[in-house]
């Protein structure tokens, strides 16, 4: 066997596979080696997690852990592009890991098909060098942040909603804030909108997820030009992005401050007043006497007399599908319009006794009933339990679910 007459900084197979990124200034061989020696944890195998995992796997990350207990559904596919139609019903974390291995068999994948919570997060996170928050709920964001601080792990956090996305790196460097530094208290749960309610375009999560992968590569390569201490805001509608500087680490922060009060994971559902998931919770804001189920409303609308049905959904949802008798008056309009204008829009008069109110899933319709009772007290407003989703499930399975 002939002796080598050259000095190689990287193996022949890696040089061939990763040649285009090896040629990039400030990344090169050292960056590739560092990336190969890095273990990255992705929390959330959805719209953000798919591009993060795909690009990091293709780039040659050493170990890729994926946390997600959910299963692939048809309404995921427009934005969660790692999955295919024949995978509907299968595990997201396993499906995404399989996709990474198909593209790059040299990557070690670890599947955590569990619901992340205070009891298991420390044990899972301790084996990773960088964490990517690709989730869509506030409680999990605080949990991920706190555990990253407690274990001294840099956190790459992304989010996307409708046309917009944002991205930052937390807890990376002495002056870099953590998420809790900026948001010491969680928002009111009723003010939080996720993509299940507000929607999102696939290219938005694709853009933000790709940029999360880029931040991971920069951190792994030990570059100083990360988004630590900065927040990138992306406006997909206008095709614009801007970066703002965040305030420095708060010495009084409850988890990363000089005298932290949080030294272990807490009860984040209690802290945030909301569940650690992106599912829509069914609210109960009204007495049963002012609510009807979809079967009862079906009987009512079968009667000969005219029905008054108020649909509180935004115009984009009303356009997807609605019952023919529905009158579109949004929840915001129920708040802002005066009684006279509401009466005019509804077409009601002094002889009208009942108006039924419907929305997507039965939450906004309850809020609307409470508002309308204050403005038009002579009319009996009744909420339809479960909204159009319940209608589609129990009355007409041809009604478009979304």
From Swiss-Prot:
It is found in: Cytoplasm, Cytosol. InterPro entries: MOCS3/Uba4, Rhodanese-like_dom, Rhodanese-like_dom_sf, ThiF/MoeB/HesA, ThiF_NAD_FAD-bd, Ubiquitin-activating_enz. Its cofactor is Zn(2+). One of its GO terms (biological process) is Mo-molybdopterin cofactor biosynthetic process. Pfam families: Rhodanese, ThiF. Zn(2+) binds at residues 178, 181, 253, 256. ATP binds at residues 47, 68, 75-79, 92, 136-137. The active site is at residues 195, 359. It comes from the Eukaryota. It catalyses: [molybdopterin-synthase sulfur-carrier protein]-C-terminal Gly-Gly + ATP + H(+) = [molybdopterin-synthase sulfur-carrier protein]-C-terminal Gly-Gly-AMP + diphosphate; [molybdopterin-synthase sulfur-carrier protein]-C-terminal Gly-Gly-AMP + S-sulfanyl-L-cysteinyl-[cysteine desulfurase] + AH2 = [molybdopterin-synthase sulfur-carrier protein]-C-terminal-Gly-aminoethanethioate + L-cysteinyl-[cysteine desulfurase] + A + AMP + 2 H(+). It is an enzyme of class 2 (transferase). GO terms for cellular component: cytoplasm; cytosol. Binds 1 zinc ion per subunit. Its EC number is 2.7.7.80, 2.8.1.11. Residues 303-400 form the Rhodanese domain. Pathway: tRNA modification; 5-methoxycarbonylmethyl-2-thiouridine-tRNA biosynthesis; Cofactor biosynthesis; molybdopterin biosynthesis. Keywords: ATP-binding, Cytoplasm, Metal-binding, Molybdenum cofactor biosynthesis, Multifunctional enzyme, Nucleotide-binding, Nucleotidyltransferase, Transferase, tRNA processing, Zinc. GO terms for molecular function: ATP binding; metal ion binding; molybdopterin-synthase adenylyltransferase activity; molybdopterin-synthase sulfurtransferase activity; nucleotidyltransferase activity; thiosulfate-cyanide sulfurtransferase activity; URM1 activating enzyme activity. Plays a central role in 2-thiolation of mcm(5)S(2)U at tRNA wobble positions of cytosolic tRNA(Lys), tRNA(Glu) and tRNA(Gln). Also essential during biosynthesis of the molybdenum cofactor. Acts by mediating the C-terminal thiocarboxylation of sulfur carriers URM1 and MOCS2A. Its N-terminus first activates URM1 and MOCS2A as acyl-adenylates (-COAMP), then the persulfide sulfur on the catalytic cysteine is transferred to URM1 and MOCS2A to form thiocarboxylation (-COSH) of their C-terminus. In the N-terminal section; belongs to the HesA/MoeB/ThiF family. UBA4 subfamily. This is Adenylyltransferase and sulfurtransferase MOCS3. It comes from Caenorhabditis briggsae. The lineage of its organism: Eukaryota, Metazoa, Ecdysozoa, Nematoda, Chromadorea. The gene is moc-3.
């Amino acid at each position: 066997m002939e002796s080598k007459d050259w000095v190689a900084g990287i193996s022949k197979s890696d040089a061939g596979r990763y040649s285009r990124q090896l040629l990039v200034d400030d990344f090169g061989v050292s960056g590739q080696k560092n990336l190969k020696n890095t273990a990255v944890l992705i929390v959330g195998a959805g719209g953000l997690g798919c591009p993060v995992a795909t690009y990091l796997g293709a780039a040659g990350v050493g170990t890729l852990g994926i946390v997600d207990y959910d299963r692939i559904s048809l309404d995921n596919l427009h934005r969660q592009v790692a999955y295919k139609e024949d995978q509907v019903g299968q595990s997201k974390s396993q499906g995404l890991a399989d996709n990474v291995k198909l593209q790059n068999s040299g990557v070690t994948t670890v599947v955590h098909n569990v619901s992340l919570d205070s009891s298991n997060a420390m044990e899972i996170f301790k084996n990773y060098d960088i964490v990517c928050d690709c989730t869509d709920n506030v409680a999990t964001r605080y949990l991920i942040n706190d555990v990253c601080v407690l274990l001294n792990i840099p956190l790459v956090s992304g989010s996307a909603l409708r046309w917009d996305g944002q991205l930052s790196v937390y807890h990376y460097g002495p002056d870099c804030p953590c998420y809790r530094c900026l948001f010491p208290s969680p928002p009111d749960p009723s003010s939080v909108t996720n993509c299940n309610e507000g929607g999102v375009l696939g290219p938005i999560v694709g853009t933000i997820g790709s940029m999360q992968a880029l931040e991971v590569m920069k951190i792994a390569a030990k570059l100083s030009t990360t988004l630590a201490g900065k927040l990138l805001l992306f406006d997909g509608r206008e095709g614009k992005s801007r970066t703002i500087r965040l305030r420095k680490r708060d010495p009084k922060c409850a988890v990363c401050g000089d005298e932290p009060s949080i030294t272990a994971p807490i009860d984040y559902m209690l802290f945030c007043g909301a569940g650690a998931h992106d599912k829509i919770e069914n609210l109960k804001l009204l007495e049963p006497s002012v609510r009807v189920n979809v079967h009862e409303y079906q009987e009512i609308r079968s009667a000969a007399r005219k029905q008054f049905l108020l649909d509180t959904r935004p115009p984009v949802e009303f356009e997807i599908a609605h019952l023919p008798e529905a009158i579109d008056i949004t929840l915001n309009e129920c708040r802002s319009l005066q009684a006279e204008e509401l009466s005019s829009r509804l077409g009601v008069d002094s002889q009208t006794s009942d108006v039924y109110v419907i929305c997507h899933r039965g939450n906004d319709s309850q809020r609307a009933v409470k508002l309308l009772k204050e403005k038009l007290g002579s009319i009996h407003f009744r909420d339809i339990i479960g909204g159009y989703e319940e209608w589609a499930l129990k009355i007409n399975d041809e009604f478009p679910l979304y």
